[in-house]
UniProtKB/Swiss-Prot annotation:
EC number assigned by the record: 4.1.1.48
Reactions it catalyzes: 1-(2-carboxyphenylamino)-1-deoxy-D-ribulose 5-phosphate + H(+) = (1S,2R)-1-C-(indol-3-yl)glycerol 3-phosphate + CO2 + H2O
Disulfide bonds: none
Enzyme class: lyase
Gene behind the chain: trpC
GO BP field: L-tryptophan biosynthetic process
Name of the protein in question: Indole-3-glycerol phosphate synthase
Annotated source species: Staphylococcus epidermidis (strain ATCC 35984 / DSM 28319 / BCRC 17069 / CCUG 31568 / BM 3577 / RP62A)
Assigned protein family: Belongs to the TrpC family.
PROSITE patterns: IGPS (PS00614)
Length: 262
């Protein structure tokens, strides 16, 4: 069984245990905060938008530096992040909906709930906890599930980041006409990463969609390798959690977009 399959089985177990029902009962409702739409930054900013991630660990990185997460979010906003991503998976990524609930209150930026969503109730919990964006991973959803969950999210005034890794997944994503697609440079089955994977998939981009490169971005040089593919933004976690100088590092990632290749 791959790590991805293991995670999805775990999510199904949580659904059976009414884990998400309990979260809806105990979380403070932070779902009506007015935030700028991520799509506006992606469409109108002349530099790459950065979704700055809060994470504690992952299957490929067992432990990241322990930070004051409240201060980390404030610094992300201070130094130019366009959105905040917060992992909510407890077992594999060390996150929680309680953390999302707490941190979403201290920022006016768009907030992404980073999790493995396979059911509508997970979207309900994400919104209640304060998310304005949810992640939909094409690899773990059927076409019907993808369409249903995307519609459910947008009908509840949430943005959706539709994540793909292969050309086939990109084709499936394009069928629902999403506003934002994330190209994951990490193969979720093997957790191997290649930042140049973005360039391969962006050859098949469409003009009515914005594209974000996710995973494997550790330096400004990594961004320079992919900016000419006409990406609109980046999702960066590990490198931002590790750096000791956010004031220099985060702004250095916001390169000028390639506006001439559409």
């Amino acid at each position: 069984m791959t790590i991805l399959n293991e995670i999805i089985e775990y999510k199904k177990t949580l659904l059976e245990r009414k884990y998400y029902d309990k979260k809806l009962e105990i979380l403070q409702d932070n779902g009506n905060v007015k935030r700028r739409k991520l799509i506006d930054s992606l469409n109108y900013d002349r530099t790459l938008s950065v979704i700055a991630e809060i994470k504690s660990k992952s299957p490929s990185v067992p432990q990241l530096p322990q930070r004051d997460l409240v201060q980390q979010v404030k610094d992300y906003q201070k130094y130019g992040a366009n959105a905040i991503s917060i992992l909510t998976d407890e077992k594999y990524f060390g996150g929680s909906f309680e953390r999302l609930n707490q941190l979403s209150k201290i920022t006016s930026l768009p907030v992404l709930c980073k999790d493995f969503i396979i059911d509508k109730i997970q979207i309900d919990v994400a919104k209640r906890a304060g998310a304005s964006i949810i992640l939909l991973i094409v690899n773990i959803l059927s076409d019907d599930q993808l369409k249903e969950l995307y519609s459910y999210a947008t009908n509840h005034n949430l943005e959706a980041l539709v994540e793909v890794h292969t050309i086939r997944e990109l084709e499936r994503a394009h069928q629902i006409n999403p506003k934002i697609i994330g190209v994951n440079n990490r193969d979720l089955k093997r957790f191997e990463t290649d930042v140049l994977h973005t360039n391969k998939l962006l050859k098949f981009k469409k003009s009515n969609c914005c594209y974000i490169s996710e995973s494997g971005i550790h330096t400004k040089e990594d961004v320079e390798k992919i900016v000419d593919s006409s990406i609109d933004g980046l999702l960066v976690g590990e490198a931002l959690m590790k750096t000791n100088d956010l004031s220099q590092f985060l702004p250095s990632l916001k390169l000028k977009k390639n506006l001439y290749d559409s």
